[in-house]
């Protein structure tokens, strides 16, 4: 009878975390209140941590890359309730259960949990990540193919060059580079080529380091639905810059989490208008968009709390010593990243209205993200150098499409026009477009089909993309998805791959 009871308990224990025998007196529990989870939607799902995470609140669970976790509740998209399945490697005590950011874990034994699998990243992004100095020859990753849905590509670091191979797939199952050697799984594929190069440029070494850590979708589980937060929880540490709407600060939330804080000038927006727009903005989630975390709107100055990008705006970055030394490869890459974020907004039928280098932010490891999307609709602006009065509103005339200037009607195609001006800012290292011209003169010249001339250092191929964005007919301008792949494939003909049979074209 005792054996039957023991087996029954072993079966039920994972589903009854509140009664777990692991929560005994010998374990230091940082947050006893977090031991009892909400009603679980699915049980028994085991996950692997992809990145380190340090708890931000008493309800959170700290973990390290490689830790095994059991997810007990997935009620909220961005934050799951989970428990540790193993003791910490250094022997220290730890909280047993708590909330975790869902984009930091992958289901155990899944392809996404493999350290060498990078998901749906483009070829140029794969090259950039493999070329980080921490990676050595033989470092590799497998990614979803850009051109062939459901298929995969292998990217390998060979000295100072990244080589790419298409992993072919049989209809009946199996993966191969050449038909003389077929593998039933990608794990077998990787295992084989880590033992021998067998036709590859080099033998596979260690997986590419995952240096780019995603931002959690919210500050914490508590701010998922209640994102009007106490301003006393925010410390303003260092002013990063100032603009027409207020100041941007590096801040600290809850004494744990670095954030960016935009403090708005009193009267710069109507709080109710902003909250309506922000509710939409908070649900827009993409790696190339700045994540809106929380707001403080009950008194002036209004705070907008977002993820922190330590290098400031792209405009300032291009004009400083570091940005002025970048070359065409990096310029095309930053343009492609912005196009990727804008393609997501395009897919969600959302319009930016103020796309410019000043509204793109620069992070670590050459990461660029679109900021302030949608805010132009609610800001009351007074910077006459950028925003000029048209039809009783103020517009950034030098970045605004002619049809939007005429009628004050914005569309994703007017954003495409602005993207063309952004390309001009990128290639000229942050120069003011239409330098020396007033807004009124720009409007007059555009009516005569004038376009910004090709900068002296601008390749014809790059300038052609700009001209496409400035098509007088909005419907004839490219989509952001088209702009994304054009920029990601910009150097396609300049490849340095040695194996023409396996090189991805």
From Swiss-Prot:
Active site positions, chain numbering: 354 (proton acceptor)
Residues recorded as bearing Phosphothreonine in the entry: 178
GO cellular component, one term: extracellular region
Chain positions with Phosphoserine modification: 37, 40
Superkingdom classification of source: Eukaryota
Tissue spec: Predominantly expressed in epithelial derived cell lines and tissues, especially normal liver, kidney, breast and colon.
Binding site for ATP: 240-248, 262
Residue numbers carrying Phosphotyrosine: 387
E.C. code: 2.7.10.2
Stretches assigned to the Protein kinase domain: 234-491
Gene3D superfamilies documented for this protein: Phosphorylase Kinase, domain 1, SH2 domain, SH3 Domains, Transferase(Phosphotransferase) domain 1
An MF annotation (GO) of this entry: non-membrane spanning protein tyrosine kinase activity
SUPFAM superfamilies, sorted: Protein kinase-like (PK-like), SH2 domain, SH3-domain
Pfam families in alphabetical order: PK_Tyr_Ser-Thr, SH2, SH3_1
Start and end residues of each SH3 domain: 42-110
Domain SH2, chain residue ranges per copy: 116-208
Main location: cytoplasm
Family note: Belongs to the protein kinase superfamily. Tyr protein kinase family. SRC subfamily.
Assembly and interaction partners: Interacts (via the SH3-domain) with PTEN. Interacts with RB1.
Reported function: Non-receptor tyrosine-protein kinase that negatively regulates cell proliferation. Positively regulates PTEN protein stability through phosphorylation of PTEN on 'Tyr-336', which in turn prevents its ubiquitination and degradation, possibly by reducing its binding to NEDD4. May function as a tumor suppressor.
PANTHER family: TYROSINE-PROTEIN KINASE
Annotated protein name in UniProt: Tyrosine-protein kinase FRK
Recorded name of the encoding gene: FRK
